[in-house]
Amino acid sequence: MNASSWSLRNLPWFRATLAQWRYALRNTIAMCLALTVAYYLNLDEPYWAMTSAAVVSFPTVGGVISKSLGRIAGSLLGAIAALLLAGHTLNEPWFFLLSMSAWLGFCTWACAHFTNNVAYAFQLAGYTAAIIAFPMVNITEASQLWDIAQARVCEVIVGILCGGMMMMILPSSSDATALLTALKNMHARLLEHASLLWQPETTDAIRAAHEGVIGQILTMNLLRIQAFWSHYRFRQQNARLNALLHQQLRMTSVISSLRRMLLNWPSPPGATREILEQLLTALASSQTDVYTVARIIAPLRPTNVADYRHVAFWQRLRYFCRLYLQSSQELHRLQSDVDDHARLPRTSGLARHTDNAEAMWSGLRTFCTLMMIGAWSIASQWDAGANALTLAAISCVLYSAVAAPFKSLSLLMRTLVLLSLFSFVVKFGLMVQISDLWQFLLFLFPLLATMQLLKLQMPKFAALWGQLIVFMGSFIAVTNPPVYNFADFLNDNLAKIVGVALAWLAFAILRPGSDARKSRRHIRALRRDFVDQLSRHPTLSESEFESLTYHHVSQLSNSQDALARRWLLRWGIVLLNCSHVVWQLRDWESRSDPLSRVRDNCISLLRGVMSERGVQQKSLAATLEELQRICDSLARHHQPAARELAAIVWRLYCSLSQLEQAPPQGTLAS
């Protein structure tokens, strides 16, 4: 190691930028202030206020507000549950254990059905009840229940208020800026994505890019929610933001649909690729208008109206251009703060799907884990069993919803071991020698500031530093009055580590469903919703089914099972393209009764091919032949409406043809 690596420039305090110092100082002051206020309010465990301030330390105002609301609601609900359950079962330890395990299992199940601050509220309701109720097993007076519950809630609220106040004093980046930047970047990336997908090749890079675009658009919904909570203007523009997200999803679908047509088009015009690249280059410019676009794509206009392939591609390309220009105009209105609510209709938020089987399994895992640890604690008369139960409850509730629970639990184990060693040195080497809180704060403030800076400067270890910051308060355990008992300290820390280790064991025995099994469940749900789309009065609108389909696809975006991801993506895109054709057929009107019967026949053909169980290959082959025959017949028809219908039916043919290599029912392998 050379001497330059030890220079002052490489120290975290000198490497930090102004934004990093603002973030570190804001969170450090909030945590120290929360600890001080809770300590002088004579709350018995003021370190929970410091932990609460650390948890809500989001980099944006909207994130702090939404998470704080969820934390307050969850803490109140958890405190009420703890009072009711512990108050009625305090003298019956087995019944107490059963009721608390059932409550935490319910909270684990419920948080899987929601997103954002609602899911966070249910998580808090679960482990706040655990934090309050499990230590109550050693008390004898029922009146202490209320004292402990209100102390925990007050500590949480103090931490939230301190975090919110420091966010107002030292504000960070604007949620509005982050959202608008993300929308503009995605708007530009859609053109790059179109250029990639309209290539004739089929590679894993194309699939990964498509999954990435879908995931980024769905992630922007979180930015929209944060902007909603932090800016009055974005609360007024919420309908427009929802419509913009739906538009970007629709453009993603149209890009995919155009790719299918290009791959199934035997002889496209020779200059198609060059014209498409010229079009994408022009759309990237903010000065491009509809007339410029019309001049560029004019050479692609079909000269033979009987060429239904050319007509279908032309119509879909024009639709994509119109969507992109409309989205550009809406983004410009958002940036310029134009108050015009009549431009876009009110649109619902992005739909989502809950895997009920996985949610039930997670709730059952939490219930069984706590029953096992509780039974062991009761049978062995372990004094620190409450700490093991509390950490196991937190681990089961928090990590049931993550993609890699074993990695997260292993990281938490490492965090607890490091904090046990660190807190031993701090508690019995420093804290026993000081008598005033301000002396301890002189040590705590620079320590927290340095840890916050390291979290920002070491992204590879950001999760570790974040957990060290959040859990440090409960290990140092600044109480009022202070307690220094080495036996209790060792027993409590050992119990916390054992609780997480047993939660890890529970995840190993009651393992989450494999990605292949999850993929089959998502595909089955997609097919079930698509069958509903074929009915005369579908439950979901076209946009709702589209966002729901993309939500299904995004659920395995981090999966290592390439086959499961590939077939979930393929089924989602196929069914989505077919649903767009079905909606267009449903809206298509003709005065010719024979043509209307042809349209109805196309929809009925889909009903014969698709079911919740899968696709029948024999029926699929016959349906594709029939659709091709319908296209050829309509192309020779004398009515313009018939040739228009032929173009729509050919799009349906292109979408369905991708399922010719679909795996057998119940598997993901051919």
From Swiss-Prot:
Matches recorded under InterPro entries: PHBA_efflux_AaeB/fusaric-R
Pfam name, any one: FUSC
GO CC aspect terms: plasma membrane
Membrane topology, as annotated: Multi-pass membrane protein
Subcellular location as annotated: Cell membrane
Keyword hit for Membrane: yes
Record GO terms (molecular function): transmembrane transporter activity
Segments crossing the lipid bilayer: 23-42, 47-69, 76-98, 118-140, 153-170, 381-403, 410-432, 437-454, 461-483, 493-510
S-S pairs: none
UniProt keywords, alphabetically: Cell membrane, Membrane, Transmembrane, Transmembrane helix, Transport
Major location category of this protein: membrane
Family under the similarity heading: Belongs to the aromatic acid exporter ArAE (TC 2.A.85) family.
Name of the protein described by the UniProt record: Uncharacterized transporter YdhK
Organism for this UniProt entry: Escherichia coli O157:H7
